[in-house]
């Protein structure tokens, strides 16, 4: 099971993950607590990770990049059109996973710690 693209819906305590292989087939649907989330993602083989841009997403993007992942942050308004059914954490993660692979998607630049400290 090699995840090529991972969509992550970030929340305060529980994180929803949706992963697909290189053919776009769903191979991972997982809900993890904060304590298990980072360790799980770090141990994955490097892949493309998509997250909605928010204050905590910049921290996770910097962290996962250090482990070889390619991380892209998407403005929330660009994820919404990809939600296929009722809005849940699982459908959001799936929508993020799909949106991050779109060739014309606009992404948010990952902020450094210094840039975030200014805010």
PLM feature spans:
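Phosphate- and other anionic-substrate recognition elements at nucleic-acid/protein interfaces
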Residues: 1-119
């Amino acid at each position: 099971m090699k995840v090529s693209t991972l969509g992550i819906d970030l929340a305060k305590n529980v994180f929803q993950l949706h992963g697909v292989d290189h053919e776009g087939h769903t191979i991972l649907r997982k809900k993890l607590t904060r304590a298990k989330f980072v360790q799980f993602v770090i141990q994955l083989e490097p892949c493309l990770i998509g997250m909605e841009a928010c204050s905590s997403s910049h921290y996770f993007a910097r962290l996962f990049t250090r482990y070889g992942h390619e991380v892209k942050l998407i403005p929330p308004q660009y994820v919404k059109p990809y939600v296929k059914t009722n809005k849940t954490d699982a459908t959001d993660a799936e929508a993020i996973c799909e949106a991050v692979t779109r060739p014309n998607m606009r992404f948010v630049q990952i902020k450094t710690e210094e840039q975030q400290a200014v805010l």
